[in-house]
C-alpha cells in the first residue's frame, strides 16, 4: 500500500519537508504564521501558503482506488476575517498571480475561474459575494470557490482551535470538524464525493493557505501544529 505520514509539532525554517510561499513565515517560537502583521497591523492584499514538500498519491491510475486521509491542525485566529484552508492542488503555487483576494482562497484567479484543481476545507470569518449567508462559516469548496456544503462557525478569536479534516474512501465522504480547547461544542460539515480523475489529479499537493483583501478583513493566522496521514490501498500482497 502507499502510506504517507508526517507531523509538525513545531515548525522550522530549516525543515526540508515544508515549503513556505507568499507571506507565510516561521516565528521564533516555532509556530507557522500566515498574513503576519507589520508594526502591529495585518497586511492586506496578501496570501500565505505552507505546503508539504512532496505530492501525495491520492488515487491509483491503474486500479482506480482512492486513498483515505486524515489531517489535523491546531491554530489561533488572531483577527476575524478571511479563510484558513486545507487545499489539494495540482502543480506549483507561485506568488505572481492574482489569488490574493479573500474569496479566491489563494488558489483561483480574480475572475473566480479555477486555475488549479482544488479540493478545500475553508474556515471563513468574512462573507464575500460567493459565500453563503452564514458568517463566520466552515465550508467545502470542490473545484470551485462556491461551496458544496456549509455550516455556521462559532469562531473564537485568540483561542486555540483544532481543525480535523478527513476523507473516507469507502464511504466517499469528506468531513471537517473544528473545535476549541475548553469548549465541548464543535462545528461539523461533510460532503459525499469520489476524489478521482473527475475531481483531482492522481497526485496532489497538500497544505494550508490564508488570504486577506482589505485592512479591516485580514486574518492573522497562527498554526501551532499540523499532522497528515494517508493510505492508498493497491492490489499488492502487503495490503
Swiss-Prot record:
Tissues of expression: Seed.
Record-level Gene Ontology MF annotations: D-mannose binding; metal ion binding
Residues annotated as binding Mn(2+): 122, 124, 131, 137
GO (cellular component) term, any one: vacuole
Binding site for Ca(2+): 124, 126, 128, 131
Entry keyword Repeat: no
Localization, UniProt: Vacuole, Aleurone grain; Vacuole
Entry-linked CDD domains: lectin_legume_LecRK_Arcelin_ConA
Keywords linked to the UniProt accession: Calcium, Lectin, Manganese, Mannose-binding, Metal-binding, Vacuole
Xref: Pfam families: Lectin_legB
Gene3D superfamilies registered for this protein in UniProt: 2.60.120.200
InterPro entries, per database record: ConA-like_dom_sf, L-lectin, Legume_lectin_dom, Leguminous_Lectin
Function summary: Lactose-binding lectin. Also binds derivatives of galactose, glucose, lactose, and mannose. Binds O-glycoproteins such as mucins more strongly than N-glycoproteins. Shows agglutinating activity towards rabbit erythrocytes.
Note: Binds one manganese (or another transition metal) ion and one calcium ion. The metal ions are essential for the saccharide-binding and cell-agglutinating activities.
Entry similarity comment: Belongs to the leguminous lectin family.
Complex and partners: Homotetramer.
Protein name: Lactose-binding lectin-2
Species of origin: Cymbosema roseum (Dioclea purpurea)
Amino acid at each position: 500500500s502507499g502510506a504517507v505520514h508526517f507531523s509538525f509539532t513545531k515548525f522550522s525554517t530549516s525543515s526540508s519537508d515544508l515549503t513556505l510561499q507568499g507571506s507565510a513565515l516561521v516565528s521564533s517560537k516555532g509556530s507557522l504564521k500566515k498574513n503576519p502583521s507589520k508594526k502591529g497591523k495585518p497586511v492586506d492584499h496578501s496570501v500565505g501558503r505552507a505546503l508539504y514538500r512532496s505530492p501525495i498519491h491520492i488515487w491509483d491510475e491503474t486500479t482506480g482506488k482512492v486513498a483515505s486521509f486524515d489531517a489535523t491542525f491546531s491554530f489561533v485566529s488572531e483577527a476575524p476575517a478571511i479563510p484558513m484552508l486545507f487545499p489539494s492542488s495540482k502543480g506549483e503555487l507561485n506568488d505572481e498571480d492574482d489569488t490574493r483576494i479573500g474569496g479566491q482562497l489563494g488558489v483561483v484567479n480574480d475572475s473566480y475561474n479555477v486555475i488549479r484543481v482544488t479540493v478545500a476545507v475553508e474556515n471563513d470569518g468574512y462573507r464575500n459575494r460567493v459565500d453563503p449567508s452564514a458568517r463566520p462559516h466552515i465550508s467545502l469548496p470542490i473545484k470551485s470557490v462556491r461551496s458544496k456544503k456549509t455550516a455556521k462557525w462559532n469562531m473564537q478569536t485568540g483561542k486555540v482551535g483544532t481543525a480535523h479534516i478527513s476523507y473516507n474512501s469507502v464511504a466517499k465522504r469528506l468531513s471537517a470538524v473544528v473545535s476549541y480547547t475548553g469548549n465541548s461544542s464543535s462545528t461539523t460539515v461533510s460532503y459525499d464525493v469520489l476524489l478521482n480523475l473527475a475531481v483531482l489529479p492522481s497526485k496532489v499537493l497538500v497544505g494550508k493557505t490564508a488570504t486577506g483583501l482589505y485592512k479591516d478583513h485580514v486574518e492573522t493566522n497562527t498554526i501551532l501544529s499540523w499532522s497528515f496521514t494517508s493510505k492508498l490501498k493497491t492490489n499488492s500482497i502487503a495490503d
